[in-house]
């Protein structure tokens, strides 16, 4: 009598890891698509070309966050790198943004909402705020505070040199909803 025994433990572990990775990718893809769907529904524009431009900017912000997360294998995202990526399309070659704060690795689940928030702030600064004026600039500072419930990131977006604010906004647009949702989480 003879027999042959194969230890398939390593293969089973690899299969389980592959299945876990597939579920994680599926989950992240569904989350990203949900964000795109919300942006499609909530984006307002006066013309189709304007709508397309706004949506391309929002999808690009989401893609930049995805790329940053994938580069670090979804372990998190460096805040300064995220800020650089979101501000670069709006700043041109001039020194129009000051970034100041400690090194912060954002948890993966916060990188995309924060990227969308920063994109909306930068877009509004270009349209209505400091970056709509040649003399204007943006300052983004942040600190990290230890709280009983965990660590809290305090991020301050300050615009200087923009046009005076004539009146408060009349409606809550997609950007405001993104900001509100990000702040709550």
Q: Where do the protein language model's features map onto the residues?
A:
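Sensory-domain boundary capping and coupling elements
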Residues: 3-5, 66
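Short beta-strand/loop element within the Bergerat-fold HATPase_c
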Residues: 135-149
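Conserved short strand/loop->alpha-helix "switch" segment adjacent to the catalytic nucleotide/phosphoryl-transfer site
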Residues: 17-22, 91-138, 170
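ATP phosphate-binding glycine-rich loop and adjacent ATP-lid/helix-beta elements
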Residues: 152, 165-185
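Short beta-to-alpha transition helix within the HATPase_c
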Residues: 53-64, 68, 75-92, 141-143
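PAS-associated C-terminal cap
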Residues: 6-17
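Conserved phosphoacceptor histidine of two-component systems
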Residues: 20-34, 38, 42
């Amino acid at each position: 009598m003879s027999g042959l025994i194969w230890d398939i433990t390593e293969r089973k572990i690899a299969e389980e890891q592959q299945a876990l990775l597939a579920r994680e990718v599926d989950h992240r893809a569904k989350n990203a698509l949900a964000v795109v769907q919300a942006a499609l529904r909530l984006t307002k524009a006066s013309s189709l070309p304007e709508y397309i431009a706004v949506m391309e900017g929002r999808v690009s912000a989401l893609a930049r966050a995805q790329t940053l997360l994938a580069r670090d294998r979804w372990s998190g995202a460096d805040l300064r790198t995220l800020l650089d990526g979101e501000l670069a399309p709006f700043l041109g070659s001039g020194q129009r943004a000051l970034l100041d704060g400690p090194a912060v690795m954002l948890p993966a689940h916060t990188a995309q909402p924060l990227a969308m928030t920063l994109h909306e702030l930068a877009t509004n600064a270009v349209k209505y705020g400091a970056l709509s004026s040649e003399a204007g600039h943006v300052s983004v500072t942040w600190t990290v505070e230890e709280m009983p419930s965990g660590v809290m990131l305090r991020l301050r977006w300050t615009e200087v040199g923009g046009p005076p604010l004539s009146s408060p906004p009349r409606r809550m647009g997609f950007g405001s909803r993104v900001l509100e949702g990000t702040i709550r989480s």
